[in-house]
Amino acid sequence: MAAFLQTNIRLEIIPGRYSSLTDHKFRAPYRIRCAAASPVKKRYNITLLPGDGIGPEVISVAKNVLQKAGFLQGLEFDFQEMPFGGAALDLVGVPLPEETSTAAKQSDAILLGAIGGYKWDKNEKHLRPEMGLLNIRRDLNVFANLRPATVLPQLVDASTLKKEVAQGVDMMIVRELTGGIYFGEPRGITINENGEEVGFNTEIYAAHEIDRIARVAFETARKRRGKLCSVDKANVLDASILWRKRVTALASEYPDVELSHMYVDNAAMQLVRDPKQFDTIVTNNIFGDILSDEASMITGSIGMLPSASLGESGPGLFEPIHGSAPDIAGQDKANPLATILSAAMLLKYGLGEEKAAKMIEDAVVDALNKGFRTGDIYSPGNKLVGCKEMGEEVLKSVDSKVPV
């Protein structure tokens, strides 16, 4: 039988900007240290950014699962929770406080819940929660966003597509994250010579930005089924012409990867017509943003999809791709599985702890096999559960995987 391990919890209050705000939910940055009675092999610093809406709920559940899987693999985590997004706006007036950015950059990995909400929709652009996300991605220099879209056999009936179309879908979308139209200059709103308001943005990519995301995509495809589809709009956009030129040039370095190209409008159609044709997709920032959300509905729910944002060095940022869902916040209705699977990606891609990651992935499948479903993936014959209970079931499944 597996040995029983005791867990000792020690709460550390770290002095900081928020330590005097005792009446707020972010009373102070804190670390929860879980020390096993048996020797610990490795220790990691993890920054938690609960954010807004359902973010705190799903982060709480995912943290417990991450903690359990790590503990069973001899890992120790120091968790530091920091304000971010709308919560930070309410607390200190900016979506990304300097202390939050510093904590993130000094950690081994960051796990984010969700940001945004109706409350801040009318704020000036620089005071919206979403700007915090764009800025932290830049601060961390995470340029590669990996978004898996897999239709699990247990959830094939939840897909919006016919069963025969959705069954067996397993793709990875590699999205460039820090360039393109979201960051390009010039941008703005001005008045033209006719006195009419004009809004404009710039889609711009340098060769090195394309090369580095293409290499990530080729390496990803090489570890999967060896097929890479580059999505662009090279029949219209100059930035896409350069994109296709650079990706094609790099293909000679990866003779074992089959490269194809597709225009983004066709790719959007093919994703719902025949999604199984795709293995790995690489595309720019705005196209990736749109296509990955489209792919999420193939899987049955946006609440199932994790993501990893990685750079050449430094900590990665891991988050579910769903939003903050303020309409169900605080009601225990959120699906925590995307955040739990983001924690698995944190272990795998951020820390290189593949065994612990596999424990979490297997536990999610196990909980689904037992019929547990949150409302977004529920179908008759299964057991409807809330966010907390789904997390508890995954925890039980992780615990059952302890080696004997």
From Swiss-Prot:
Pathway: Amino-acid biosynthesis; L-leucine biosynthesis; L-leucine from 3-methyl-2-oxobutanoate: step 3/4. Its cofactor is Mg(2+); Mn(2+). Pfam families: Iso_dh (PF00180). It comes from Arabidopsis thaliana (Mouse-ear cress). Residues 1-34 form a transit peptide. The record marks Y182, K233 as: Important for catalysis. Transmembrane segments: none annotated. One of its GO terms (molecular function) is NAD binding. Mostly expressed constitutively at high levels in seedlings, cotyledons, hypocotyls, flowers, pollen and leaves and, to a lower extent, in roots and stems. Binds 1 Mg(2+) or Mn(2+) ion per subunit. Keywords: Amino-acid biosynthesis, Branched-chain amino acid biosynthesis, Chloroplast, Leucine biosynthesis, Magnesium, Manganese, Metal-binding, NAD, Oxidoreductase, Plastid, Transit peptide. PANTHER family: 3-ISOPROPYLMALATE DEHYDROGENASE (PTHR42979), 3-ISOPROPYLMALATE DEHYDROGENASE 1, CHLOROPLASTIC-RELATED (PTHR42979:SF5). Its main location: plastid. Induction: Transactivated by MYB28. The record marks C229, C387 as: Essential for redox regulation. Belongs to the isocitrate and isopropylmalate dehydrogenases family. Disruption phenotype: No discernible vegetative or reproductive phenotypes, but decreased leucine biosynthetic enzyme activities and lower free leucine concentrations. NAD(+) binds at residues 115-130, 235, 266, 319-335. GO terms for biological process: L-leucine biosynthetic process. It catalyses: (2R,3S)-3-isopropylmalate + NAD(+) = 4-methyl-2-oxopentanoate + CO2 + NADH. Involved in leucine biosynthesis; catalyzes the oxidative decarboxylation step in leucine biosynthesis (primary metabolism). Catalyzes the oxidation of 3-carboxy-2-hydroxy-4-methylpentanoate (3-isopropylmalate, 3-IPM) to 3-carboxy-4-methyl-2-oxopentanoate. The product decarboxylates to 4-methyl-2 oxopentanoate. Substrate binds at R137, R147, R175, D265. Regulated by a thiol-based redox modification. This is 3-isopropylmalate dehydrogenase 3, chloroplastic. Its EC number is 1.1.1.85. One of its GO terms (cellular component) is plastid.
